Amino acid sequence: MALIRLVAPERVFSDLASMVAYPNFQVQDKITLLGSAGGDFTFTTTASVVDNGTVFAVPGGYLLRKFVGPAYSSWFSNWAGIVTFMSAPNRHLVVDTVLQATSVLNIKSNSTLEFTDTGRILPDAAVARQVLNIIGSAPSVFVPLAADAAAGSKVITVAAGALSAVKGTYLYLRSNKLCDGGPNTYGVKISQIRKVVGVSTSGGVTSIRLDKALHYNYYLSDAAEVGIPTMVENVTLVSPYINEFGYDDLNRFFTIGISANFAADLHIQDGVIIGNKRPGASDIEGRSAIKFNNCVDSTVKGTCFYNIGWYGVEVLGCSEDTEVHDIHAMDVRHAISLNWQSTADGDKWGEPIEFLGVNCEAYNTTQAGFDTHDIGKRVKFVRCVSYDSADDGFQARTNGVEYLNCRAYRAAMDGFASNTGVAFPIYRECLAYDNVRSGFNCSYGGGYVYDCEAHGSQNGVRINGGRVKGGRYTRNSSSHIFVTKDVAETAQTSLEIDGVSMRYDGTGRAVYFHGTMGIDPTLVSMSNNDMTGHGLFWALLSGYTVQPTPPRMSRNLLDDTGIRGVATLVAGEATVNARVRGNFGSVANSFKWVSEVKLTRLTFPSSAGALAVTSVAQNQDVPTPNPDLNSFVIRSSNAADVSQVAWEVYL
């Protein structure tokens, strides 16, 4: 008999089947189940939700497991029981076994799901579906605002009694105004989630104070309205492990590994999520490892993604204050993708705001390593790295994306790229190495490139406006800086190139001006750049039918020798051999230019006159001109001048 000891009211069982079949439990009984799934139980006749892990149905009533702290998956006899257990809020489950999902696992507020080294969840083998859901819902009822609410405001108003908002309530605001974060809204309208910190009513109007300022103007003319969503709050996933490596098992499809919608304070750390895509294959069924839609205050840390059909982390809707740290994504479409909310029909709402990616790595992505899809505001990547992407390393398709100390290696296109109409991404101290087309591509709408490096590409920087300041560029086969427009309709804006190292290393020109795309060199200024070694051939021009006016230039270097010295005037004149250079022809695809010679008088005799440079001459020796035999003349307005004069040669 399975009942091995009976000393009333103590009942001890060696197996679960015998315990749940026992017919004579009493409320006062002390009940113990032995074994790895064992524990102490109490008997009750009060109706309880059966999950076959913490609550069992037995003859005449229910057995309730006595425990403090988390429940363990090893307690449960099937997946359905775990789903039942987690269907209520305030749950804590430790997954310490391999679980075969047969449905979606929904996680409610104030819950924690953590995995041991042996715990994992295998996706449903019968139906491709989501694995873990943290899902709230949009408001079912909206009310109009009572007055306009301007961007920056932390107060909205509604008619008194129209909205049952109290302190701690979440609100969902929206209007018909289109999002403005990027150049292509795709019809997505503005929306935001805010939390109520105070409510007051006066004169038929309720004023609601919000926890954060609004990012947009919510005007009555745009049908601005507000409702109360159902939010899932305060969920933590520790070391979630979804799927196993097994490329021959094509039944382990899932659409989304972890899906969150209308959630707040969701934190995922140290996970592993494995897709079902064969290594290197193009996209297949299965969208994202983690998806945040209309979520606020979310984090992902230290999580790895492998062979995902689409995205490692996807952020869309009005998700706000999302941080992703220390992820590793291998063979996915994008490691991180900021996206627009898409529906088959009907309205679309919200763009990601305040996104931060830190120390994230993407390997062998099938498209860009990191992408921002057309909308989004205040997006920043710090110390992120893309290796061997099949497209760009980083792609900015929304305005003003900022990259700090990021790196792109061996991208099939650009190391860092923007897209049509995207205005002024910001790159600071970033490195692009051996990318096929360019290190940094800002030719769709301008950009700012500060103290960056690009090595081993066709072009170091492609740009049509903005600023390239500081940094170092080597081994770029065509040019270090290519002034062009990748789309003819894009307007060229002023471009400053300042303090950049573009020394000649046997390949390419320093700067390439693309007349074919209508580039006007007079909108470019160049100062303090080191173009040592390029000599006469520092610039490349193409597509001009008449000779263009050169850019504004000051204190640029073409050589590192023969560019400084001291001359003593004799009878008001001195001829100086120096590496002065110039192009004096009128060929269309060339600039007419001459070196700038700065003169500084060192002595001041009574015969001193005004100084000027005349007669710049270039050596014409055949077959190889000698630049050290180039010369210029310093001439004083006083033929008796015997001053000593320091000279410096610049472009």
Feature locations, PLM:
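Extracellular beta-helix/beta-solenoid repeat scaffolds
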Residues: 5-66, 92-142, 239
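Extracellular beta-strand-rich solenoid/capping regions of secreted or surface-exposed proteins
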Residues: 83-86, 100-114, 121-154, 158-163, ...
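Short glycine/acidic-rich loop motifs that flank beta-strands on beta-rich extracellular proteins
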Residues: 102-104, 122-127, 246-256, 277-289, ...
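All-beta strand scaffolds that present successive hydrophobic residues in beta-strands
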Residues: 113-116, 165, 232, 236-239, ...
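Extended Gly/Ser/Thr-rich low-complexity repeat segments
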Residues: 164-182, 215-241, 583-603, 642-651
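Right-handed parallel beta-helix
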Residues: 175-202, 231-356, 361-364, 369, ...
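Extracellular attachment/recognition segments
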Residues: 559-651
